[in-house]
């Protein structure tokens, strides 16, 4: 607060704008408290271009290891697969007990002769699932016998990884408020702390701007959750349902979205964001709890805990009704996982100070000699472009902050639109 006093004093005692140098102030606590840090991965930067790194864990077929059930380091190794038959409509009729076959790079073993003979399902993938349930075939993930890797010519599967880098330019937001010295004196005379009042005014409005940017970007990059016959268009229709039925249906979809994220990324969802009405439906259904003893675990911005353990955040400004399930995970000191990354630019200040978010400046109007106090915030907001690109060459030219290209591409957050009865407001 003393810094703003110093700014005001400087603006009224300096004879010329060219002589007085604007005083750079650190930052404000109010902004930090209002930013939804629980739904975005935060990585501070002191460079005008924020750099992010991503690690891919790949199998010998250059697939993400977590997206396939295939194993390569055991009895059915990478080279062994070249001799294993691929399952097709024709080959499935020739299989006998003890045979190995592969489907989508996963190896299976036949447990009885002609395992598909009595399965009438025409869809090959579903027929295979039925055969597994009926114990006609099994997944073949066996470890190799010790002797397999003792020979000099044994083939050992490669453990592959790839580190990618992408960059996003830091951008700016700026707000100002005009104040006369007389107004500041009147505020003080009426019991207000004028510097504190002005600081909180600008900081709160700036935090609201950043929050909207984060939430609306999260809506943009999240993949749409579509289920045949239920949410074909990415919307669930609750306009006809009773309150208990609507709550159960929406909570069920939230739980399915949690499982979807875990299957697609191996990470467990850590938060749920919903529009005001969607959050109210979850609360009315009884699936939302907020006990006094939960306060020490619950973020001050959260609405409460869902029954599956996810904190629920309420988006009160959204033009649509929706629910998003997503991941923000801090793994160790350097590794952060999230659907989008928020990188506040700290202008060379202490990166360990969590309050470093923006900077105050005073500019004096040369005509009235009255000061205007402004708050400038710089930050980068980015999604991972490697979830978009078809290949590495294309990925290098994609800007992670280009929300047009990032739309609907993130595997770490899933959105479901919610159709509700329209509210009638009397004029």
Curated annotation (Swiss-Prot):
The record marks 10-11 as: Cleavage. Proteolytic cleavage at the N-terminus by the prohead core protein protease gives rise to the mature capsid vertex protein. The keyword Protein transport does not apply. Pfam families: Gp23. One of its GO terms (cellular component) is viral capsid. It comes from the Viruses. The keyword Transferase does not apply. Keywords: Capsid protein, Late protein, Virion. Capsid protein that self-associates to form pentons, building the capsid in association with hexamers of the major capsid protein and one dodecamer of the portal protein. The capsid vertex protein self-associates to form 11 pentons, building the T=13 laevo capsid in association with 160 hexamers of the major capsid protein. Belongs to the Tevenvirinae capsid vertex family. Homopentamer. Interacts with the portal protein. Interacts with the major capsid protein that forms 160 hexamers. This is Capsid vertex protein.
């Amino acid at each position: 607060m003393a810094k703003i006093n110093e700014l005001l004093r400087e603006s009224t005692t300096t004879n010329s704008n060219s002589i007085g140098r604007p005083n750079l102030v650190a930052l404000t606590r109010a902004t930090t408290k209002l930013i939804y840090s629980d739904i975005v991965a935060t990585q501070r930067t002191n460079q005008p271009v924020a750099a992010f790194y991503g690690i891919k864990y790949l199998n010998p077929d250059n697939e993400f290891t977590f997206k396939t059930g295939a194993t390569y380091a055991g009895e059915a190794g990478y080279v062994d697969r070249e001799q294993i038959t691929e399952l097709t409509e024709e080959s499935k009729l020739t299989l006998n007990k003890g045979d190995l076959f592969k489907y989508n790079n996963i190896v299976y073993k036949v447990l009885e002769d002609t395992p598909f003979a009595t399965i009438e399902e025409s869809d090959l993938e579903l027929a295979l699932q039925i055969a597994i349930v009926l114990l006609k075939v099994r997944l073949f993930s066996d470890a190799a016998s010790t002797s397999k890797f003792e020979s000099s010519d044994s083939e050992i599967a490669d453990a592959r990884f790839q580190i990618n880098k992408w960059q996003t330019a830091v951008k700016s937001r700026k707000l100002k408020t005009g104040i006369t010295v007389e107004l500041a004196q009147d505020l003080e005379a009426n019991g207000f702390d004028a510097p504190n009042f002005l600081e909180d005014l600008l900081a709160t409005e700036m935090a609201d701007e950043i929050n909207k940017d984060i939430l609306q970007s999260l809506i943009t990059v999240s993949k749409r959750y579509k289920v045949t016959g239920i949410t074909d268009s990415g919307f669930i229709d609750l306009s006809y349902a009773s309150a208990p039925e609507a709550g159960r249906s929406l909570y069920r979809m939230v739980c399915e979205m949690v499982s979807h994220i875990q299957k697609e990324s191996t990470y467990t969802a850590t938060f749920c964001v919903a529009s005001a009405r969607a959050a109210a439906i979850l609360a009315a259904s009884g699936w939302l709890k907020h006990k006094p003893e939960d306060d020490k675990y619950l973020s001050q911005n959260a609405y409460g805990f869902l029954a599956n353990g996810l904190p629920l955040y309420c988006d009160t400004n959204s033009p649509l009704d929706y629910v998003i399930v997503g991941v923000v995970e801090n793994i160790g000191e350097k590794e952060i996982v999230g659907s989008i990354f928020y990188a506040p630019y700290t202008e060379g200040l202490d990166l360990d100070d969590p309050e470093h978010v923006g900077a105050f400046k005073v500019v004096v109007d040369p005509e009235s000699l009255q000061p205007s106090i402004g708050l400038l915030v710089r930050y980068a907001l980015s999604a991972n472009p490697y979830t978009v690109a078809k290949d590495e060459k294309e990925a290098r030219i994609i800007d992670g902050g280009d929300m047009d290209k990032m739309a609907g591409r993130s595997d770490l957050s899933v959105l479901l639109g919610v159709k509700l009865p329209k509210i009638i407001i009397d004029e």
